[in-house]
Amino acid sequence: MDYDYEKLGLKVGLEIHQQLNTKRKLFCNCPTKIRDDEPHGEIERFLRPSQSEMGQVDKAAILESRKEKKFIYQYYNDTTCLVELDDEPPHNVSEEGLNTALEVSTLMNMNFADEIHVMRKMVIDGSNTSGFQRTMFVSQDGFIETEYGKIRITSLCLEEDSCKKVEDGRDYTKYCVDRLGIPLLEITTEPDITSPKMGKEAARRIGTILRATGKVKRGLGTIRQDVNISIKNGARIEVKGVQNLDLIEKIIENEVTRQVSLNNLKEELIGRNAEVLDEIIDVTELLNDTESKVLRGALKNKGVIKAILLKGFSGLIGKEVQPGRRLGTEFSDRGKVLGGVGGLFHTDELPKYGITDEEVNKLKKFMNCGENDAVILVADAKNKAERALLAVIERAKESLIGIPEETRKALDDGNTSYLRPLPGAARMYPETDVPKILITSEICERIKNNLPEMPEEKTIRFIKEYELNEDLAKQMVMSYNVELFENLSKKYPNIKPTLIATTLEATLKEIKREGLDTEVLTDEHLNELFLGLSEDKMSKEAIPEVIKGYINNPNMKLDEVLDVAGLSKMSKEEVEAVILDIINQNILIVNEKGMGATGLLMGRCMAQLRGKADGKLINVTLQNKLKEKVQGQ
């Protein structure tokens, strides 16, 4: 839907979280390596909220503790340590991580803090073993320029990343601590963004600055965007975990649709004199003989069926508020998160779940349900069902007032779902185990004098210096392999930089699409490959097969890969002999077509010689030998 975003008073702010590609973690010497092999062990914990320095307890922390979830943490003996498991004090802050934070701050025109103090930010969703995240305020009051105008940068913080979620059960969550402690930059903008397109452009520009440092991780999950969205007569909504830049625009559009729809529903509910009753009624006996598989499943597990009455809500619970999501989905999300139930049912949709019309009418009569009223059911264990319905009652009451402020989770389709209330300010307190860091004038000067080349400047240089076309230059500048490209181009001047760039960007992607793990390749492999090419040990046509050889046999040297694959480069004389043999085998075609047989013969030559000789040499040799044969007839 097209909206007048200015008239709606749309305001959007971003929080960008970017992992840094440092040698060690922020507070220990473990590598910043994410693993997917079998962990070496597990520990279990329960986390509980505690008071801040001001004697307050954060409401989001209280909510999480009500879930009574057990947290399981996987670890590795060789790449994680006791710091991640919260059994050893943190070490000093990673100097590499801090320098990168200061560098990015400078590129965004920010003012450094004179002293950097490590703080503890309370987290009780289990994603930190300690129940808090260590974070430090580095800089403030900056700005970036975009094609839509200037966007102010509020702050930049350096913090530790959280654990990686492995599994989420009803009563437990399993994490791996390999990600915990990886240095993470948190960049927060002011709510200066006034359209979905501007939101996407702001995130793209910040991402460009981050990649310019050459010190950030790449790939899915290494950058996460949180988007704060509000409109007039709406509420501030924090959308967590947008991993795809292209999704930001759609997330903003759909959240605007959601808030506009919820405001319209509020007006309709008020017009109906809608009311939410607090009473939770047990209807287990009433529906004890139902044939509904969903309800019977709960009853077989010694569950109960509980119900609430929403006066004036009939026909509105099924109203769409986002593409494919309804007001009932909003209620269901609350019940799932706060009650731990699988879902809920309402009278507008009950026949879909195998509940008969007769049972629906009986239920409505039992609940004193009027024509405009609706009933919501939950079938589960007694305590879960009651917790879920209490959450639904609260959310239904909020729908009569307006839009609740909350934190929502980004979904892959551009929609969002309820996660938790917006956190309060009572979740931060000082870290006493790490000393403060002074940012001296010498440090500031060193950072300013060693700033990286910005992508726009580097693109122009690549076009001039390496003779790349504009598209390839832009692609190479934004590549994780940009430093490797420059090193190889300077080391092997007899190889065209275009070939090196194409190999690093296009060839590797093509091989990855074939299902091969290109992560196995090291810089040493690629260096050896181009060394072999520069020494005429192989042809450029052999590059894809050599790379595949390295992937399948990472410990092999180039000569071994070439030998196994039969790709050792032929001499000119050997190429001539093969081509003459092919011409003689197809002499009848040559006699009939003369030079017109070139295309057919070239295909047969390449079938035998591809990867063993340069295509140009094969083509020239074939032309010459074929001409000799034709003229000699």
UniProtKB/Swiss-Prot annotation:
Keywords: ATP-binding, Ligase, Nucleotide-binding, Protein biosynthesis. Its EC number is 6.3.5.-. Signal peptide: none annotated. The keyword Cell cycle does not apply. One of its GO terms (cellular component) is cytoplasm. It holds the Pfam family GAD. InterPro entries: Asn/Gln-tRNA_amidoTrfase_suB/E, Asn/Gln-tRNA_Trfase_suB/E_cat, Asn/Gln_amidotransferase, Asn/Gln_tRNA_amidoTrase-B-like, GAD-like_sf, GAD_dom, GatB_C_1, GatB_Yqey_C_2. PROSITE patterns: GATB. Belongs to the GatB/GatE family. GatE subfamily. Allows the formation of correctly charged Gln-tRNA(Gln) through the transamidation of misacylated Glu-tRNA(Gln) in organisms which lack glutaminyl-tRNA synthetase. The reaction takes place in the presence of glutamine and ATP through an activated gamma-phospho-Glu-tRNA(Gln). The GatDE system is specific for glutamate and does not act on aspartate. PANTHER family: GLUTAMYL-TRNA GLN AMIDOTRANSFERASE SUBUNIT B MITOCHONDRIAL AND PROKARYOTIC PET112-RELATED (PTHR11659), GLUTAMYL-TRNA(GLN) AMIDOTRANSFERASE SUBUNIT E (PTHR11659:SF2). This is Glutamyl-tRNA(Gln) amidotransferase subunit E. It comes from Methanococcus vannielii (strain ATCC 35089 / DSM 1224 / JCM 13029 / OCM 148 / SB).
